[in-house]
Amino acid sequence: MTERTLTLAFESSCDETSVAVIENGTKILSNIVATQIDSHQRFGGVVPEVASRHHIEQITKCTNEALEQADVDYNDLDAVAVTYGPGLVGSLLIGVTAAKAIAWAHNLPLVPVNHMAGHIYAARYVGEFQYPQMALLVSGGHTELVYMPSEHEYQIIGETRDDAAGEAYDKIGRVLGVNYPAGKTIDEWAAKGKDTFNFPRAMEKEDNYDFSFSGLKSAFINTVHNADQRGEKLDKYDLAASFQQSVIDVLAEKTMRALDDYPVKQLILAGGVAANHGLRARLDHDMKEFHPDVPMLQAPLKLCGDNAAMIGAAGYVNYKHGDRAGLDLNAVPGLMFDRIQSK
């Protein structure tokens, strides 16, 4: 009989308060998510002070609900896992403090988790991981290609030099009058439009795996503002389609090139922007055409955004590998995987 390991996991890196109970890193017994989107929408983005206050209000409620839904108590737990970075320092501290308090009070090991590792392991709920593997992480704060030679080993081979893809979505969303977060609406609009504006594909042909989206963002904003000054009304669906096509072309091109150079057994697609239907469809197509022997695991739609279930999955791996933190664990807002020299 397989030994049962229960992990209580905390995620509070940005604007979602989430607590989950995970069995053996692969079974979700509960995954409570308290979102703050309504509070941040009128500001057009996340306000750190507001986010921290909401985390304080929600963290105890979420913890109690997670335990109740999983039908377990503290005595059943084997470990407490928590995101300690990257993210907003004030938000991270709420989760870290709660996790430390519970670990201390119930004499449980405290397992630190990198938020980005959590996003990768969200795909673990879809199927078994095979190594070596490549992960394309696309979110509001990060856009990275991560090579994993083995479990618990992460090497960045490419990343954005400026804006993350999700950040660019939100910024152009403001120009289009779309509420934060803008990604879902722009994805829906893009499906109704055509790539008529031919926005730049920055760094697409450069001999590396890095990304850049600030030039695309500027080109988009200038196009809309110039049209406004001429009194010209541009089609919002075509604008969305043109923007999204530029983003997807670069993400897909760089990912295929990375897979050409790094023989892997699997590709993982994860992060908030991994919920984008256009991106999923393009990668499905390109993998079948260019790398038919490499299976792709896409994080489930409901686990693409920030949640504690993904932290529990990554936390279980860390727990198995002996990762432990003391009660002096602190938030590390700029936490990163190691960067390696590209092949």
From Swiss-Prot:
InterPro entries: ATPase_NBD (IPR043129), Gcp-like_dom (IPR000905), KAE1/TsaD (IPR017861), Peptidase_M22_CS (IPR017860), TsaD (IPR022450). Fe cation binds at H115, H119, D306. GO terms for molecular function: iron ion binding; N(6)-L-threonylcarbamoyladenine synthase activity. Substrate binds at L137, V138, S139, G140, G141, D170, G183, D187, N276. Pfam families: TsaD. Binds 1 Fe(2+) ion per subunit. Its cofactor is Fe(2+). GO terms for cellular component: cytoplasm. Its EC number is 2.3.1.234. Keywords: Acyltransferase, Cytoplasm, Iron, Metal-binding, Transferase, tRNA processing. It catalyses: L-threonylcarbamoyladenylate + adenosine(37) in tRNA = N(6)-L-threonylcarbamoyladenosine(37) in tRNA + AMP + H(+). Coiled coil: none annotated. It is found in: Cytoplasm. GO terms for biological process: tRNA threonylcarbamoyladenosine modification. CDD domains: ASKHA_NBD_TsaD_bac. Belongs to the KAE1 / TsaD family. PANTHER family: TRNA N6-ADENOSINE THREONYLCARBAMOYLTRANSFERASE, TRNA N6-ADENOSINE THREONYLCARBAMOYLTRANSFERASE, MITOCHONDRIAL. Required for the formation of a threonylcarbamoyl group on adenosine at position 37 (t(6)A37) in tRNAs that read codons beginning with adenine. Is involved in the transfer of the threonylcarbamoyl moiety of threonylcarbamoyl-AMP (TC-AMP) to the N6 group of A37, together with TsaE and TsaB. TsaD likely plays a direct catalytic role in this reaction. This is tRNA N6-adenosine threonylcarbamoyltransferase.
